[in-house]
């Protein structure tokens, strides 16, 4: 998989980094890896996505709670690379959320900054399942054969290619 592409005049990821040996060593100490792909809060799809949770950060709070209950799973929270795009940077960021929640103190959580070019596709290939809010990488993960748990309504959640529970309790049950 290659990450060298242009969309809406923005060049994304001229190089995509493979999972390094430190990550692979860390992951080897867990039963499974679950990547969590976020969105940018300014994305025009966000207001329409919030049918189960108040917003993406409400969902991330629940993800953090579940991660703390499941120490045998490595959760990899991947901030959207567009989060820090020049002239579009979010005021409210996943990186800010991660800092305020001190996720770096959790042994079973890895936070991937929006500035890191870590391959999301390699994460998907190593995953037990993939969690998204409503990012289109969920559709890509589904095409790659991964089970995808969506927490927000997306352009593809009406098709039987992903899991899209309709209540917070159902999302919580599917996560376990």
Predicted regions and their residues:
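Generic beta-strand/beta-sheet core signal
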Residues: 37-39, 78-82, 112-114, 132-134, ...
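Catalytic donor nucleotide-activated moiety binding site of glycosyltransferases and closely related
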Residues: 64-116
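Glycine- and acidic
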Residues: 41-51, 76-85, 110, 122
């Amino acid at each position: 998989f290659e990450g060298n592409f242009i969309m809406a005049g923005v060049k994304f990821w001229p190089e995509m980094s493979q999972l390094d040996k430190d990550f692979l060593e860390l992951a080897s100490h867990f039963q499974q890896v679950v990547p969590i792909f976020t969105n940018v809060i300014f994305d025009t799809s966000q207001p329409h996505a919030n049918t189960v949770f108040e917003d993406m950060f409400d969902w991330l709070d629940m993800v953090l709670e579940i991660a703390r209950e499941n120490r045998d799973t490595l959760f990899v929270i991947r901030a959207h690379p567009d989060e820090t795009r020049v002239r579009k940077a979010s005021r409210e960021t996943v990186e800010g959320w991660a800092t305020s929640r001190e996720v770096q103190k959790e042994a079973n959580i890895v936070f991937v900054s929006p500035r890191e070019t870590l391959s999301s596709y390699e994460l998907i290939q190593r995953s037990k399942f993939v969690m998204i809010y409503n990012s289109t990488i969920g559709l890509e993960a589904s095409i790659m054969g991964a089970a995808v748990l969506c927490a927000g309504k997306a352009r593809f959640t009406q098709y039987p290619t992903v899991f899209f529970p309709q209540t917070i309790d159902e999302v919580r049950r599917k996560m376990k």
